[in-house]
Amino acid sequence: MLDVNNFEYMNIGLASPDKIRSWSYGEVKKPETINYRTLKPEKDGLFCERIFGPQKDWECHCGKYKRVRYKGVVCDRCGVEVTRAKVRRERMGHIELAAPVSHIWYFKGIPSRMGLVLDMSPRALEEVIYFASYVVTDPANTPLEKKQLLSEKEYRAYLDKYGNKFQASMGAEAIHKLLQDIDLDKEVDMLKEELKTSQGQRRTRAIKRLEVLEAFRNSGNKPSWMILDVLPVIPPELRPMVQLDGGRFATSDLNDLYRRVINRNNRLKRLLDLGAPSIIVQNEKRMLQEAVDALIDNGRRGRPVTGPGNRPLKSLSHMLKGKQGRFRQNLLGKRVDYSGRSVIVVGPNLKMYQCGLPKEMALELFKPFVMKELVEKGLAHNIKSAKRKIERVQPEVWDVLESVIKEHPVLLNRAPTLHRLGIQAFEPTLVEGRAIRLHPLVCTAYNADFDGDQMAVHVPLSAEAQAEARILMLAAQNILNPKDGKPVVTPSQDMVLGNYYLTLERPGAVGEGMIFKDTDEALLAYQNGYVHLHTRVAVAVNSLKNETFTEEQRSKLLITTVGKLIFNEILPPSFPYMNEPTKSNIEEKTPDRFFLDYGADVKEAIKNQEINPPFKKGILGKIIAEIFKRFHITETSKMLDRMKNLGFKYSTKAGITVGVSDIVVLDDKQEILEEAQGKVDNVMKQFRRGLITEEERYERVISIWSAAKDTIQGKLMKSLDEINPIYMMSDSGARGNASNFTQLAGMRGLMANPAGRIIELPIKSSFREGLTVLEYFISTHGARKGLADTALKTADSGYLTRRLVDVAQDVIIRETDCGTDRGILAKAITEGTEVIERLEERLVGRFARKPVKHPETGEVLVNENELIDEDKAIEIVEAGIEEVWIRSAFTCNTSHGVCKRCYGRNLATGTDVEVGEAVGIIAAQSIGEPGTQLTMRTFHTGGVAGDDITQGLPRIQELFEARNPKGQATISEIDGVVAEINEVRDKQQEIVVQGEVESRSYTAPYNARLKVTEGEKISRGQVLTEGSVDPKELLKVTDITTVQEYLLHEVQKVYRMQGVEIGDKHVEVMVRQMLRKVRVIDAGDTEVLPGTLLDIHQFTEANKKVLLEGKRPATGRPVLLGITKASLETDSFLSAASFQETTRVLTDAAIKGKRDELLGLKENVIIGKLVPAGTGMLNYRKVKPVLQVQSSDEMVPAE
């Protein structure tokens, strides 16, 4: 067998008849499979042991030789070699065909490869191959032409006229002869000459033919090999036949298809031997051709061959295609040993890096380890007795299991794994029961809840795997989200509520203004009921453990609450004392106004201070981010555990409940509604008088009711009591929001009908009051659409992620610096006046391309190739700089990847990205994972043509697939001035742009809103009307940079509108993959063919070569490919074939004799090598691990 890790590339090509015979271990002559009496394979049949090897290890067919000592002996009675049975998985056979047949992939594919080589139409080919017409193979000196088709009648007539002077025949034999006669070199030269003169369709056809002929010439494949003389038979274990309970047999469809081929082949041989009339022989040959077609690709031509119950049989092609095919089912996703799955329940007492593993599950997963340990400790004499001990679950087994499990991380995975945080490592602790315990803080990353979710457990076996799991994948290491670099482990729900309740301040609470000497005394007072958690009190500063107080402050009193004293205990001592939820308190220090001199009137001071809001979810997130920035991972994960415990404890103590009485209906709701109704009646009156159009009336009514709802919402939130449980839930960010509350107590507001148009009758009732029947009915539309959308969205979003992963899977950080001198000009992304992404967000974690200087002082803020961190970014923005040149993946010169400098900081770790990081896949996951949060709807606000702009997920797909957008905008192709805007017929408008040399006129579609005015100066690529730009058009009139920028901005716009933040660099990586190819226009003196798509790097290499020789370089135009197209155009045929259109990709690759260099991740997974990313990169693979035992307490210290 091949050593998987030792080959460098993989070739694919056409197999010659001799090659097929050399693979084979014998000819399959009979269609029989198994003898139904003895259940032994028939000799010379499809399962023959002499050809394919023995069915049982070390045992021949007749039983003369048994046992391993006869290894390699060929039995003299039955001819079977004594060897392992698993050779039946690799030994092939063959069938000698009595007549050549065509391979359907090459004759039927689009474009037909056979047709291009012979310059015949696929229709003509089909007529010849399936015996409907004759083709002239040698016209000799008759007026007939080579490759001319003749019907039966014409053929007879010409035979009578010319006798045997000319040769014409039908079937694959005729095509075989034509293919053998082709002189590739001569044809290629003729085509190259033709290209110089031809135009239009002839040129396109010539380019296609040239491509195929060049492919044959360069790859060493012979065109005649597209016709098969001999058919390979795949190993029997890959098309098994198994006996079912009732004595019946279940068999693979391939056996049926092979059987038909063999039957027809044998019948044809017999007919030929008998010298049957040609019409019978021809019919049999046609049937043989159809049988082989069905075997290779059933259903590609004509009606598929069906089995019992009219089910089409699965052919060889179907075995590779689709989700259930070989590629996606068995090569890219395998089931693995040492794994299990179970329901998850919450484990609030676990540490960040722990999970609870049910005892019986752990025992089964770690069985081999436990057995080894039992023998080593002398608790069992040998492995067999150790196994027996485990199966009987004897008490000493548990102690051994405990010791084995310590230090051995396991991986937990929850499907669907949308991003890399869907698999994390934990240290297992044994728990009773049968459910896996999961730490509450990692739920966000897994998107898990405990309503019956299940998770899978996997055990990393080797020392290297365990080390990687512990160092890279431990849950305590994965605190930041790779998509935006923000903490992903922020507390949620109960934890938020507990900390919110704890940090509340209530005026006039019991014991207000008391002074304590230290925290302990305050707690004692609280426990004895003298003060409340929410009471504002004063504490001597010098007794607090916090190290950030100044000497001056240490001699004062601090005004705070008992709850905040408790809250600050969980923060590191060198972190500012948190007394108010502000940015300055988190980043700098506790504000001065909370400090009082000894002897001051504390009660008076407290009365004069306004109430500070409690700590909400967002503030907790900021505290975590700041702690991570200052103290890194270990300290952060310990702090998170303390915050979690505090949250749970105090949300329990708060005892927050929700009752009907908590939902208070607004008093002046009726007045607001009546006022709105009055306005609506007014609008209706205007409409009836013909003062406004139907469209305007609708718009106004909608806006009146929206305003009414907003008024109610505002008043509601104001009228609520601070300690109303529902208000606390929504205000803290634990659950629900203002809109939910408005629907409960205010009014439901406007609803959309099934078409997405807003119904102008609002729902005036709230849930608390109860809806009328009509209101209830109207509500069901929206609810149902929501559920349907969600179901569709999940599938769409998953497919988007899959396409994104496929297009970027080979983008890996390959080197430290690519040495490019280009970059991009980063400025804030805006939409009108609204800022979508601020400049500092775009700069953080990027390398500067040019030095950044202060506009006034000229001081250099950031040097060239220096990393811009948070502080530098803020400094740049405060200096009033609005645009900065930065390094970007767009302009990186590294082939098959990006360099460290152009990529910048790794968002998942907050440090420099490592060489070997698979940034392409991380980018794809970061864009795909929030896909489910995007809306599906195309918003119709009243159906104005200009407003039907796609948003949400469909817009993202439109952008990444580079489709023509809906509601397309017109763009200017030249620089110039808008000379005039004229109304032409049917409300259409004509815009005339006057350039320096020429003028262009554009017709704006009916009703489109213009974005330019007369006399305005515009540049090429500028939008003239409202709508989305077609990026392909934009690329034609401008340059790559403009298109890259446009796509980046548009993608960010969609995500930010939905409140999802994604790092620019992820979108950059994806867009870069879409703009990798160049379409060759003129080949110059290079080897490349005009009209072909080439990778930019191959294109520049080819040009470099000819320029050095002083010849003419090729010219090309950059092409924007959608992600599906880009995936299929990748250099790796394995990756492309496993993505989509498997047969087309393989057909093409085989003809070109493609060579897969195994650079990407997918190719290596398919052939079973380590992926060439991360620790699998060659420069890291040479490192050998040295085992040093150290206890996990040092990794993440115990509490």
From Swiss-Prot:
Cofactors that this protein relies on: Mg(2+); Zn(2+)
Recorded GO MF terms: DNA binding; DNA-directed RNA polymerase activity; magnesium ion binding; zinc ion binding
GO cellular-component term (any): DNA-directed RNA polymerase complex
Residues given in the record as Zn(2+) 2 binding sites: 818, 892, 899, 902
EC numbers on record: 2.7.7.6
Keywords (A to Z) from UniProt: DNA-directed RNA polymerase, Magnesium, Metal-binding, Nucleotidyltransferase, Transcription, Transferase, Zinc
Positions that bind Mg(2+): 449, 451, 453
Pfam name, any one: RNA_pol_Rpb1_3
GO-annotated biological processes: DNA-templated transcription
Gene3D superfamilies, per database record: 1.10.132.30, 1.10.150.390, 1.10.1790.20, 1.10.40.90, 2.40.40.20, 2.40.50.100, RNA polymerase II, clamp domain, RNA polymerase Rpb1, domain 3
Binding, Zn(2+) 1: 60, 62, 75, 78
EC category name: transferase
Cofactor, free-text remark: Binds 1 Mg(2+) ion per subunit.
Entry keyword annotation includes Protein transport: no
Catalytic reaction annotation: RNA(n) + a ribonucleoside 5'-triphosphate = RNA(n+1) + diphosphate
HAMAP family referenced in this protein's UniProt entry, alphabetically: RNApol_bact_RpoC
Stored PANTHER family: DNA-DIRECTED RNA POLYMERASE, DNA-DIRECTED RNA POLYMERASE SUBUNIT BETA
Function, as annotated: DNA-dependent RNA polymerase catalyzes the transcription of DNA into RNA using the four ribonucleoside triphosphates as substrates.
Subunit structure: The RNAP catalytic core consists of 2 alpha, 1 beta, 1 beta' and 1 omega subunit. When a sigma factor is associated with the core the holoenzyme is formed, which can initiate transcription.
Protein family membership: Belongs to the RNA polymerase beta' chain family.
This protein's name: DNA-directed RNA polymerase subunit beta'
Organism: Bacillus licheniformis (strain ATCC 14580 / DSM 13 / JCM 2505 / CCUG 7422 / NBRC 12200 / NCIMB 9375 / NCTC 10341 / NRRL NRS-1264 / Gibson 46)
Organismal lineage: Bacteria, Bacillati, Bacillota, Bacilli, Bacillales
